Amino acid sequence: MKLNPSLLTAAGLVSAQLASALPQASSSTVSPSPSPSATPGSFVTTSGLNFVIDGKTGYFAGSNSYWIGFQKNNDDVDLVFSHLQESGLKILRVWGFNDVNQKPTDGSVYYHLLADGTATVNEGEDGLQRLDYVVSSAEKHGIKLIINFVNFWDDYGGINAYVKAFGGSKEDFYTNDAMQAAYRAYIKAVISRYSDSTAIFAWELANEPRCQGCETTVLYNWIESTSQYIKSLDSKHLVCIGDEGFGLDTGSDGSYPYQYSEGSDFAKNLAIPTIDFGTFHLYPSSWGTTNDWGNGWVTSHGAACKEAGKPCLFEEYGVTSDHCAVEKPWQNTALNTTAISGDLYWQYGDQLSGGPSPDDGNTFYYGTDDFKCLVTDHIAAINSRN
């Protein structure tokens, strides 16, 4: 999801400002914290077209929270995970990146400083130690995390943060040796902290990687080599791409998302042996399609995943209004489509110590009518199916 700052609620901004106003902690010179110890459970695996979580095979639901790793109040983090656990949601996708080109002076959280051709991982209390706590709380509450390593969009730095530090263009990121070396060093730094944690659902290459106008071989080669690298560091966890599902002949109506103009070939990329499952997103209003069109998008990807012999995760979907009326049919379609083994709505909202969590326009909040419709009732349907 590409965030729209103008849609953040005032309360959400206040919450973020309160978090960033806390005193700055130590910087990248601090030694890494030890990986949070694993609680009883098991590593997530796949079985045919299904996911297996803690020994249970079936369909699982979850959500996205780009902001949780940037919170400085541990109680807020624990509150979110306790509500996820209570509601029956099992997976949370979080930003594992927060790239900056200049070190913040206000004490705000950042993970990775990219400047003047160099890259420094922030392992301090205002850096990856915040992600440490997210992983630790997820372990305690039995929630599984998808952690990604970079953003295609400029929110929280993204690929353009690398471009500003090393030169070139966003398209160059996938093939530039210097940018890829910095990216891989960051991947290694993150994975080394959590490789033994059963809270990790999967490592994800990026949020919505695109290469507009590129041959599909550019993304393919990058996905293949990067996923191989991740597996060389950690063979215990699943690996996925984090793509939107663009570039697909199966079920195609010729509309923009099915085309290959963003440099992605969904089926070809999914066939890479070191990619364990498929990911796809759904935002009709951003793609020039209709809400009803989304049901075909879901079934098309289910068919492609079935053909590949791997499960699919309906990883992001959202609208800015009428959440229940619009998103419920998508959930039902996903739940009843072979090879779709889970869905994560965009995005989770809760009441934190400083006010409501950020609202990018697609958020709905814990305890609301929309939450009952799209979480409580959805979990009941999943439990009935499983």
From Swiss-Prot:
It holds the Pfam family Cellulase. Residues 1-21 form the signal peptide. GO terms for molecular function: mannan endo-1,4-beta-mannosidase activity. One of its GO terms (cellular component) is extracellular region. One of its GO terms (biological process) is mannan catabolic process. Keywords: Carbohydrate metabolism, Glycoprotein, Glycosidase, Hydrolase, Secreted, Signal. The active site is at residues 208, 316. It catalyses: Random hydrolysis of (1->4)-beta-D-mannosidic linkages in mannans, galactomannans and glucomannans. Glycans are attached at residue 336. Its EC number is 3.2.1.78. The keyword Glycoprotein applies. Substrate binds at residues 95, 207, 283, 346. InterPro entries: Glyco_hydro_5, Glycoside_hydrolase_SF, MAN-like. It is found in: Secreted. Belongs to the glycosyl hydrolase 5 (cellulase A) family. Endo-1,4-mannanase, a crucial enzyme for depolymerization of seed galactomannans and wood galactoglucomannans. This is Probable mannan endo-1,4-beta-mannosidase A. It comes from Aspergillus flavus (strain ATCC 200026 / FGSC A1120 / IAM 13836 / NRRL 3357 / JCM 12722 / SRRC 167).
